[in-house]
A protein has these predicted regions:
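ASCE P-loop NTPase helicase motor core
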Residues: 46-149, 157, 162, 166-259
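Charge-rich, solvent-exposed alpha-helical interaction surfaces
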Residues: 20-23, 27, 38-42, 64
Length: 259
């Protein structure tokens, strides 16, 4: 994977910490990591590999995902707004926790993580102190008093527990991770908001990885001229989820029904 020497700066709803970008830089430069190389060193294909199985609202998505993960380590799911992506993610996490799996859900924003924590299927685990979140704010403590603060924002993979962390925090965990893979499952929410190195970073953190997002959603906002992005070949990096779905073979699903 070739990257121009000029820095590329990406912005979400708020400017991300510089350390987030440095984390991703370190992940890209670590050429010895097999897990990330599977994503970063992808072969661009002329014809898209995206050929998802459509899943109706009446179907149990968990069955499809878990069956696929018996023979693969990764799954990609897409769904337009209103197709219940977060609801279905909550159901998946609840089933995994019931099987005493360690689960990380990571997303660009703290707001997205809060929405996950508030899902009805996760209420028993929230009430029993089995859901923790990094950088827990006073407002979040007020809204979800049973949500456990991850003091020190440490990588806290624990069987039967859900960890919630932003891309910024989880990218740091991935950067520092050597050979061990801490979580049984990593679920990347808002995957369309992830740069390609963040997509790759998630593979360092979980034995099984589920990416879920909307391929048609806007990619991360980048404060760099679009012509320069195209000239330097940065578009696949910026549109990480799109690059993943169109170039890397894996089980894929499309949520087609709105609730």
């Amino acid at each position: 994977m070739q990257i121009c020497l000029n820095p590329i700066i990406a912005f979400g709803p708020n400017d991300p910490p510089l350390k987030y970008l440095l984390n991703l830089k370190d992940i890209v430069q670590n050429s010895e990591c097999k897990a990330t190389k599977e994503i970063l060193d992808y072969f661009s294909v002329e014809e898209s590999t995206w050929n998802p199985q459509k899943v109706a609202a009446t179907e149990d998505l968990n069955i499809h995902i878990l069956r696929s993960l018996e023979s693969h380590n990764t799954v990609a799911i897409q769904g337009p707004p209103g197709t219940g992506k977060t609801y279905r993610m909550g159901r998946l996490v609840a089933q995994l926790l019931s099987e005493r799996k360690s689960v990380l859900v990571t997303a660009l924003t703290n707001e997205a993580l809060k929405v996950v924590a508030s899902k009805e299927d996760l209420k028993p685990y929230l009430e029993s102190g089995k859901v923790s979140k990094t950088s827990l704010t006073i407002d979040e403590r007020h809204e979800l008093p049973k949500l456990v603060a991850n003091e020190g924002n440490v990588c806290n993979a624990t069987p039967g527990h859900l960890s919630l962390a932003t891309f910024y925090i989880s990218s740091g965990w991935a950067k520092d991770m050597l050979e061990t893979t801490p979580f049984d499952y990593v679920i990347v929410d808002e995957a369309s908001q992830a740069l390609l190195p963040m997509i790759a970073a998630s593979k360092k953190l979980g034995s099984k990885v589920v990416w879920i997002g909307d391929q048609k959603q806007l990619a991360p906002i980048v404060k760099t001229n679009e012509d320069k992005i195209n000239t330097c070949g940065w578009s696949p990096i910026v549109k990480g989820f799109d690059t993943l779905c169109n170039n890397i073979p894996m089980p894929t699903f499309m949520l087609s029904d709105t609730f």
